Amino acid sequence: MFPDSFMHIGQALDLVSRYDSLRNPLTSLGDYLDPELISRCLAESGTVTLRKRRLPLEMMVWCIVGMALERKEPLHQIVNRLDIMLPGNRPFVAPSAVIQARQRLGSEAVRRVFTKTAQLWHNATPHPHWCGLTLLAIDGVFWRTPDTPENDAAFPRQTHAGNPALYPQVKMVCQMELTSHLLTAAAFGTMKNSENELAEQLIEQTGDNTLTLMDKGYYSLGLLNGWSLAGEHRHWMIPLRKGAQYEELRKLGKGDHLVKLKTSPQARKKWPGLGNEVTARLLTVTRKGKVCHLLTSMTDAMRFPGGEMADLYSHRWEIELGYREIKQTMQLSRLTLRSKKPELVEQELWGVLLAYNLVRYQMIKMAEHLKGYWPNQLSFSESCGMVMRMLMTLQGASPGRIPELMRDLASMGQLVKLPTRRGRAFPRVVKERPWKYPTAPKKSQSVA
């Protein structure tokens, strides 16, 4: 009896070890990120190695993604949980080996993976359009880095009233598709770079037949004119700067005018294609008793109705919600990044954007199985946990079951549906600011 039992156990262990030696982690994770795309990005960035290591560079991309999805876990634990290392004599990987592998990978390869997957997933998603235009928005965000000498030298601190900030910071500008929350492009620099300078880098990455919503911080006639001239029907909408001078050319409707704005010599010097004047469309709307002026490049009143355009600008807030999902939900409100060196800081930031898009693209697939639901009507926090659990499940699954597991994930949209938001039961009230110490009631002054 016992010899037979030991024989069966030995056969089982032999099969497991044989399967583990032949298993390729890229095979199971390839449905999320194409292994050929990762290899191509590594080759284009010049990140190649001839030595066969236990942590291949292709799998280190998944480590960077896991860093963003599992913010509270150490790096070596993420590698062990995802099981992305090649078989070896030791069952686990040392923490120092993960750091060395990150340094070999660098940031350029991860940036290329994010850029290519952003374009690929954006083109593969059937976005809803408004008057034939895809709705985009750009906005800036700050990231805090660990206070190390290397980061301090690479990322100058912002000063307030002559006092430097507590941590070095990175300034980032992202472009987002508003209905799916997919990031389509991103650029970042130091606090010495203005958001307009970073937004210039997004012009070439913006597609045709798009409408980009911006806040008033991006008001620059050179930037806006260059945005329109970079392609076909690349429109923008932005609040008019306070005190801006313009000349009304023609009235298009109630609160709707075609206007002409003069450019400055400094702007024409910086933007060679900028003329002396810029023609735009000015919309004047009243919201809750406040008059707002919106400037846009959509001058065709027949194609773009002014009444709908005024309501369209409120959707710009979707990118703010996207930043909240990244910082509070995915990063667990841990405002300081992990990496202690500038190259690894950039690598970590590209990994955060890549992980966010990965979750959002899976939410798009789940929404396709739900009639009448959009991706932004699903729970982002639940989807994050579901994607991370699936990544760990794929490593232990046989190759034949991987398509079935992926179909199961896409059909799990019922579990992450957000309930319909209930209406307000009581009127909104602004409460009095709490004070640290109690205050005595004021005595009425006596009349002399």
Regions found by a protein language model. Name each.
Residues M1-L75, R90, R102-L105, R112-T115, ...:
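Single, function-defining residue in the core of a domain
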Residues I78:
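Short alpha-helical "recognition helix" segments of helix-turn-helix
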Residues D83-I99:
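Short, basic interhelical loop/turn and adjoining N-cap
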Residues M85, L105-E108, L120, L332:
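A short structural micro-motif
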Residues E108-A124:
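Short Lys/Arg-enriched helix C-cap and helix-to-coil transition segments
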